Each structure stands twice: as C-alpha cells, then as structure tokens.
Design a protein with these regions (language model features):
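CN hydrolase (nitrilase-like) catalytic-core segments centered on the catalytic cysteine
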Residues: 75, 117-118, 258, 265-266, ...
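Conserved beta-strand and immediately adjacent loop positions that scaffold enzyme active sites
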Residues: 217, 306, 337, 410, ...
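Soluble catalytic regions of membrane-associated enzymes that act on cell-envelope
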Residues: 203-331, 341-344, 350, 354
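Short, conserved active-site loops that position catalytic residues or coordinate cofactors/metal ions
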Residues: 24-40, 63-68, 222-223, 255-268, ...
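Membrane-embedded alpha-helical bundles of multi-pass enzymes
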Residues: 2-207, 381, 394, 411-417, ...
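Active-site catalytic loop in hydrolytic enzyme cores
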Residues: 71-81, 107, 126-156, 282-285, ...
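Generic structural signal for well-ordered alpha-helices
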Residues: 96, 100, 245-249, 338, ...
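Short, solvent-exposed cationic patches
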Residues: 335-349, 370, 375, 437-458
Length: 473
C-alpha cells in the first residue's frame, strides 16, 4: 500500500512538473498551465502538510528549469540570484498547494477552487508592485496564443487571465481529490463551467466586434550588430545611423506613415546629436513618414535611453526617455515624462522596451488618448517571443495598437485585440524590415478606467480566506 502511494505521489509530481515545464517560460504551450497544478492539488489532501508542500515545491522547481539557460547563460544573472528566484517561486507554489489542501480537507471544494486563483493573483500582484521587473514571469503571458482568453484583460487587466487559468486548475484538482459531497461537486462543475465559458464567449465576442477605425501603414526595421559596435567609438555609431537612414529611404514602401527603428541604435554625444537629427529629419521628409529612432543621448553628466520622433515633414517633434531601466545593466538616467503625438490617424505614444512590462504606464497613456504605441526595443533573441507578447498584452488591456521594433528580437505589429498583423525576426549583419497596416481607434477599456481593481479584489479575498483558515486551525 505504501509503495502504491509513493508511486502515485511521484507520478503526480512528475506530471505537474512536465506540464509546468512546457507550459511556462519563454515558449509556453498555452493549454498546459490549465492542467499543470491539477495532479499535485488532487493528491494533496491525502498527504501530510509537509509532504504536500514538498511535492508542490519540487514540481514547480523542476518546471522552472526551463528558464535555467536563459537566466544563467543569456542574461548572466549571478548563481545566487537565480537560485533565490527559483526557490522563492517554488515556495509560493508549494504554499498555494497547502492553502488549497486546507479547504479540501474541510470538505469545501468550492472554496478550495477559489482559493487557488485568488492566492496566486494576490502573490503575482504583490510581486509586480515590489519587483523592478514588474509583471515578468506572470502566468497570463502563457496564454498569448489563445486570443479569446486574453480579451478578459480589457476588463480585469492581466490578473483576470491568471485567475481563469488557475480557477480551472483548482476546480479540476478539487474534483479529482474526491473532497466534498456529491451536490457540492456538482455545483462546482456548473459554477466553474459558467465562469470559464463566459470568459471564452466574451473573448470571442470582443474579437469579432469592430469600431470605426483609420488604417495606418507602419514599417518596422532593425539590424542586429555586435555589442562591440554599440560600445565602440562614436564614429562607428554615426556610420551605423547613416546606414539606417539610407535603409529607411530604400526600404520603406510608398504610403508608409510611420517607421519604427530599434532601441539604442547608437550612443551619441550632445555635439553629434544635431547631425543625427538632421539625418533622420531628412529621411522623414524624403519618405513623408514619421520616424521613431532609439538612441542613447550622452551628456557630460549623464546619459539617457531615448526615443526621438521625427514628423513626416522632417521636424523633431518629441523626445522620450525610457522610464524603466534594467537594474545592473542600464546605467542611464530614467525619464518620467509621457510623449504623445497628435497625427491625422490619431494619437501616438512613445515607450521603450521594458517600459511595457509595467501595466501602469501603458494605462496612463491610454487614459490620455493614445491609440497607437510606437516602441523601439532590444531583446536577447531567445526571449523574443515572450517579450514581444508582453507588450502585445498591454495593447489588449488598454485598447491601442502596437508597433514594436526589437533588435535581437521580433518586429511586431499588432492590433488592439492582440492579433499579430505583421511579424518577422531580425538577423545579424543585415537589415530586416516588415510593413503592415493596422487599424487604430480610440477605444478606452474598462481596465483603463478602473485600473487594478480585480487584483485588489483578489488580495482582499485572500486575506479573508487566510483568516478563515487560521481560525479553523
């Protein structure tokens, strides 16, 4: 009997580990997170609390190994930082298993099903507030290949996606555990089915709904170059920028209205900035298209990671400085201003790369009327899908279109529903470009108006459920 229980325990742990390994990380399979916690949750009530925690901890830790190469060898985090990150995430999952187990052992499958997503969203929200990387690693990004699911973000923000996924997982685990009376399990099936089906129906409806919009033709362009060129003398930077300006003239199709170039195409001093501005003002006038250029502006006392906007008539109309810099990697000074450009098709906003990991900034832009976000970026190749989709989800949350050009990444054009309209990967040593049309429309979402109300609801509900659990103990 003991050997049978041990085999069941190991099988449950390995099943959850495998599902989380392939369902999270840089290239997730969207349906796997819906099932990943189920085996562990289903068996948890039959185990002692210590065993249930260790099972959840081990399963999630093994699943997180899908990020090891990225963390250790691509972004080269210190080993102790990686271990701390992986262990904390596994502890959070293990505690979530214990939280659900406490309700299952008291015969409350409905509360157990609610407890898991409520706990998870509360933890994700606290992490997003406290972490310098905000929503990086959020469960919601695993769902970017399932467009109906992510539409709920226009109401709840990113938090509603995580909730729906783990509500299904929690309910399935509770049902398989056998906890509760038959009528309770029947009510649970009906309630969760209604909620999950409603979210899919809403998503399908939103994808099919349309509003009067204006099409904008956008060209995205980038060239991957060695780090030695970026860190090299200013002459090399100016040469590369000149090549970009020539490529803009050559490759932008007639009728292009906006051209987005990547983040940090070069580092230039104040004395050379006028030359760069003249170069791209001329290119903008020649193509009759607005140009967004990402550069590092170096002053005697500081440097700024900037995005500069040149209008179709060749004028420098805006300079945006990146708000959210990567700790320990970007030494530049953070900006704090929004830049919005009123154009014939609507109001365009500027952000840079990591800025779009932070929901609040995009929500502020949307509240100010932005309907197209122009985003220079710089990724690490292996994370190109994930980081582009994080930005796409900001567009879904807030009802704006997105044009994102990432060196060492993807050139991505998406609409305000998250549909990818044009996309291609960059390549080393040569220019790559893609052109597409995107409909832009002023469409303020419920999430834009109300903010993180759903996350706060989950935090409040978690406090109530935790107090109830402590009182019952």
């Amino acid at each position: 009997m003991q050997s049978r229980k041990l085999v069941l325990l190991i099988a449950a742990g390995l099943a959850s580990a495998a599902l989380s390994y392939f369902g999270t990380g840089l290239h997730p399979i969207w349906w796997m997170p819906w099932l990943a916690p189920v085996p562990v949750l289903a068996i948890a009530p039959r185990l002692r609390s210590s065993a249930a925690f260790l099972l959840g901890f081990a399963a999630w830790l093994i699943g997180e190994m899908n990020q090891w190469n990225y963390l250790r060898h691509v972004i080269e985090l210190p080993l102790q930082t990686i271990i701390l990150f992986l262990v904390i995430s596994a502890v959070v999952f293990g505690l979530g298993v214990l939280f659900v187990r406490s309700f299952l052992r008291r015969g409350s499958p409905l509360l157990a099903s609610l407890a898991f997503p409520i706990y998870w969203v509360a933890c994700e929200y606290v992490n997003a507030i406290a972490s310098p990387h905000s929503t990086w690693g959020n469960l919601a990004y695993t769902q970017m290949d399932c467009l109906p699911v992510i539409q709920i973000a226009s109401i709840t923000g990113i938090w509603g996606i995580s909730f729906i996924v783990f509500l299904f997982a929690g309910a399935t685990g509770a049902l398989l555990s056998g906890a509760g009376k038959p009528w309770q399990r029947g009510a649970l099936v009906i309630a969760v089915s209604v909620v999950v089906c409603a979210s899919f129906v809403f998503g399908k409806w939103r994808l099919e709904s349309t509003s009067p919009a204006q099409p904008v033709t956008v060209t995205l362009m980038a060239r991957d170059v060695p780090m030695s060129i970026y860190l090299g003398p200013e002459e090399e930077a100016l040469k590369l920028l000149g090549e970009y300006a020539d490529e803009v003239r050559r490759a932008a199709p007639p009728g292009t209205q906006a051209i987005v170039l990547p983040e940090k195409t070069g580092r230039v001093s104040e004395s050379a900035l006028a030359e760069v501005d003249a170069l791209f003002s001329s290119a903008a006038a020649a193509t009759q298209a607005a140009i967004v250029l990402g550069i590092v502006r170096r002053t005697p006392g500081a440097a700024f990671n900037s995005s500069r906007f040149y209008s179709p008539d060749g004028k420098l109309e805006g300079n945006y400085d990146k708000h959210h810099l990567i700790p320990g990697i970007e030494p530049e000074i953070a900006g704090d201003k929004h830049v919005l450009l009123d154009q014939p098709p609507g109001r365009w906003g500027l952000q840079i790369c990591k800025d779009m990991d932070f929901p609040k900034l995009s929500r502020e832009y949307a509240a100010e009327g932005a309907n197209l976000m122009l985003v220079p970026a710089w990724d690490f190749n292996v994370d190109r899908w994930l980081h582009s989709r994080m930005a796409v989800l900001r567009a879904v949350e807030n009802g704006f279109a997105l044009a994102r050009s990432a060196r060492n990444g993807l050139l991505t054009l998406s609409d305000n529903r998250g549909r990818i309209l044009a996309e291609t990967a960059t390549a080393p040593g040569r220019f790559v470009s893609v052109t597409g049309k995107v409909n832009v429309v002023r469409e303020e979402t419920f999430y834009t108006r109300t903010g993180d109300w759903f996350a706060w609801l989950c935090v409040s509900a978690f406090i109530v459920l935790a107090a109830r659990t402590i009182a019952a103990a």
